[in-house]
From Swiss-Prot:
Membrane-spanning parts: 16-36, 73-93, 126-146, 170-190, 199-219, 273-293, 303-323, 328-348, 355-375, 383-403
Lineage, opening ranks: Bacteria, Bacillati, Bacillota, Bacilli, Bacillales
InterPro entries associated with the record: Dup_hybrid_motif (IPR011055), Glu_permease_IIB (IPR036878), PTrfase_EIIB_Cys (IPR018113), PTS_EIIA_1_perm (IPR001127), PTS_EIIC (IPR003352), PTS_EIIC_1 (IPR013013), PTS_Glucose_EIICBA (IPR050429), PTS_IIB_1 (IPR001996)
Residue intervals of the PTS EIIB type-1 domain: 425-506
Keyword tags: Cell membrane, Kinase, Membrane, Phosphotransferase system, Sugar transport, Transferase, Transmembrane, Transmembrane helix, Transport
Encoding gene (name): ptsG
Residue ranges of domain PTS EIIC type-1 in the record: 3-414
Protein's name according to its UniProt entry: PTS system glucose-specific EIICBA component
List of catalytic residues: C447 (phosphocysteine intermediate), H603 (tele-phosphohistidine intermediate)
Catalytic activity from the UniProt record: N(pros)-phospho-L-histidyl-[protein] + D-glucose(out) = D-glucose 6-phosphate(in) + L-histidyl-[protein]
A GO molecular-function descriptor: protein-phosphocysteine-sugar phosphotransferase activity
PROSITE patterns, sorted: PTS_EIIA_TYPE_1 (PS51093), PTS_EIIA_TYPE_1_HIS (PS00371), PTS_EIIB_TYPE_1 (PS51098), PTS_EIIB_TYPE_1_CYS (PS01035), PTS_EIIC_TYPE_1 (PS51103)
Organism: Staphylococcus aureus (strain MRSA252)
PTS EIIA type-1 domain sequence ranges: 551-655
Enzyme Commission number(s) from the entry: 2.7.1.199
Record text about domains: The EIIC domain forms the PTS system translocation channel and contains the specific substrate-binding site.
Length: 681
């Protein structure tokens, strides 16, 4: 139960990133528009006082502000899409539910425009509806409910005379009903909840703000490995605290208050729960990256320089720290704990210096410039000396502990990994043993990426042993184990089933010859990795980063690096000259190898293995040579959208030694057949 809840919280945390991703664009418009109307920038650029320029500045401020004014609705739509695998039907359901809930609450409580005029009432006008103000929390609740309706009813079957309303069309209907019902308990319970939240936040800030900001920074950083930090910081940024704007409206949340104060040009009081990240992300972590580079073995420094350099630059500019943090998190947990303490101390330091800095995305230089330097409303320059001190601390602490405790940070790994080896015929036996033996297997299945096993006793499963046998990851959901063996997962499942049925497994055709041992971790493909491989788009559609694919196996790159495409046409074409290496029996996935040796997996949609091949038409067979642009598979796009979790199609480089992918057209935007998708090295 606890692990199931943890998994759900992780999904919610990731779903919150979709609406949050909109904020930088809104913040950019708001920050530039506000700065152009301010005396500080006009002093240096007198020409912007021109009436036409000022009109544009006001329009930019309004365009950015409208996003922050409607954050609850945006969170409702974003959370619904994120938890429903990216399907737009969930967003429609969320919008329907959001307006129905607000309208019903307003009518039930008899809220009028006159009531809204009293800031203490807790009422507001939402999309023109006088109703109870539930804030971002209300949006998140509706988004989660819409996603539940989608996941529960998207493939529902109805009698033929109601067939038009079957499948995904049924989801908004159910959402209308459930949100109407939800409105009544929300109307009765939410005022008490809101009062409690306000009392908690006021007490927290009034009792000892210094301790509060330290604990916020410390805990938020510790939650990053679990993906729960988005849930933790949301109430601080969007609900805790209050401030009355010039129009008499009560604004809640540290980030929303900060943005509103920037927009109005008011005296800054917010930013306490954001500003501490600027010294860490712009100075501390890049210095840690330098320490990791300096402690790497000489023969590995060239590779480490590329990895750490790009991670440090990303942290400095954008405040995205995960690429750098995950490079030492698992091999040096003490360093990560110290990093979390320093993060908390950074929040405390800037609070004691009476700074008030905020951001729309993260604590990188871009937000620092737009919302700190340009508005010039606080002593933004104090971040620089604090950051330089942090850089020195991070560098010497990291360098000392890495050397002293012999941490295997990037570039310090042993030359030969202690990889387990198993011959091709031994592997299914070894996997079965690691799963606890035949008696422990309740249900055995597989798809193109993973072995899915429901076990009777999870304690009998040897997770490290599975990883030694080649699983790039092992996921646990209750008694359900998912071992990520990649394209050979189905073959392993088939052979395990034969063993459990008393049959002898001999010379699997999809694996290497028995005379060759399969070395799982240490594999010499240096010749292949030195080549440059051009991959063209196999589909027409919208490019999406793997990190946004709603499947942990792909988003965490357990299968390998790559990208995804949300198709607009139902065709898959060869992305290069090569050969068809493997076709999954249910036709939803195909493995290719290029003439230059690059191995590529194209997985059409998510959970499409459950369609059992329906909606797919093959035009090639295993072992067939293909030319770039040849038609490989036709698929019924409407059928997949109506019957599968998502139509988003991951395109994965399955060779672990190839990690340098250059996305020529970026990781977002539209792409067509034959356009260069990426270059792999």
């Amino acid at each position: 139960m606890r692990k199931k809840l943890f998994g759900q919280l992780q999904r919610i945390g990731k779903a919150l990133m979709l609406p949050v991703a909109i904020l930088p664009a809104a913040g950019l418009l708001l920050a530039i528009g506000t700065a152009m109307q301010g005396e500080a920038l006009q002093h240096y650029l007198p020409f912007i006082q021109n009436g036409g320029v000022q009109t544009v500045a006001k329009l930019m401020t309004g365009a950015g502000g409208i996003i922050f004014d409607n954050l609850p609705m945006i969170f409702a739509l974003g959370v619904a899409i994120g938890l429903a695998g990216g399907d737009g039907v969930a967003a429609i359901a969320a919008f329907v539910g959001y307006i129905i809930m607000n309208k019903t609450m307003g009518d039930f409580l008899q809220v009028t425009p006159k009531n809204i005029g009293d800031p203490a009432s807790g009422y507001a006008s939402i999309l023109g509806i006088p109703t109870l103000q539930t804030g971002v929390f209300g949006g998140i609740i509706i988004g989660a409910l819409a996603a539940w309706c989608y996941n529960k009813f998207y493939n529902i079957n109805l009698p033929s005379y109601l067939g038009f309303f079957a499948g995904k069309r049924f989801v908004p209907i159910m959402m209308a009903t459930t949100s109407f019902i939800l409105a009544f308990p929300m109307a009765l319970i939410w005022p008490t909840i809101q009062t409690g939240l306000n009392a908690f936040s006021t007490g927290l800030l009034d009792s000892n703000t210094g301790v509060a900001v330290f604990l916020f920074g410390f805990i938020k950083r510790l939650l990053i490995p679990f993906g729960l930090h988005h849930i933790f910081h949301a109430p601080f940024w969007f609900e805790f605290g209050s401030w009355k704007n010039a129009a008499g409206e009560i604004i809640h949340g540290d980030q929303r208050i900060f943005i509103e104060q920037i927009r109005e040009g008011a005296h800054l009081t917010a930013g306490k729960f954001m500003q501490g990240e600027f010294p860490v992300m712009m100075f501390g972590l890049p210095a840690a990256a330098l320490a990791i580079y300096h402690t790497a073995k000489p023969e590995n420094k060239k590779v480490v320089a590329g990895l750490m350099g790009s991670a440090a630059l990303t942290s400095f500019l954008t405040g995205i720290t995960e690429p750098l943090e995950f490079s030492f998190l698992f091999v040096a947990p003490l360093l990560f704990f110290i990093h979390a303490v320093l993060d908390g101390l950074s929040f405390l330091t800037l609070y004691l210096l009476d700074l008030h800095l905020g951001y729309t995305f993260s604590g990188g230089f871009i937000d620092y410039f737009l919302l700190g330097i340009l508005p010039n409303k606080t002593q933004w320059w104090l971040v620089i000396p604090v950051g330089l001190v942090y850089a020195v601390i991070y560098y010497f602490v990291f360098r000392f502990l890495i050397v002293k405790l012999k941490y295997k940070t990037p570039g310090r790994e042993d030359k030969q990994s202690q990889a387990a080896t198993a011959s091709a015929t031994e592997l299914p036996y070894a996997v079965l043993e690691a799963m606890g033996g035949k008696a422990n297997i309740k249900h055995l299945d597989a798809c193109i990426t993973r072995l899915r096993v429901e076990v009777n006793d999870k304690s009998k499963v040897d997770v490290p042993g599975l990883k030694d046998l080649g699983a790039s990851g092992v996921l646990e959901v209750g008694n359900n184990m998912q071992a990520i063996f990649g394209p050979k997962s189905d073959q392993i499942k088939h052979e395990m089933q034969q063993i459990m049925n008393g049959q002898v497994v001999e010379n699997p055709t999809t694996m290497e010859d028995d005379k060759d041992e399969t070395v799982v971790v240490a594999e010499d493909k240096s010749a292949t990795s030195e080549l440059s491989h051009i991959v063209h788009a196999p589909l027409t559609g919208e490019v999406t980063p793997l990190s946004e694919v709603p499947d942990q196996v792909f988003s965490e790159k357990m299968m390998g690096d790559g990208i995804a495409i949300k198709p607009s046409q139902g065709e898959v074409r060869a992305p290069f000259n090569g050969k068809v290496q493997m076709i999954f029996p249910t036709k939803h996935a195909i493995g290719l190898v290029s003439d230059s040796g690059l191995e590529l997996l194209i997985h059409i949609g998510l959970d499409t293995v459950k369609l059992n091949g329906e909606g797919f038409t093959l035009h090639v067979e295993e072992g067939q040579e293909v030319k770039q642009g040849d038609l490989l598979i036709n698929f019924d796009l409407d059928y997949i959208r109506n019957h599968a979790k998502s139509d988003i199609t991951p395109i994965i480089v399955t060779q672990g030694n190839i990690t340098n992918l250059d996305f020529k057209q970026g990781e977002h935007g539209n792409i067509s057949f034959g356009d260069q998708l990426f270059e792999a090295k």
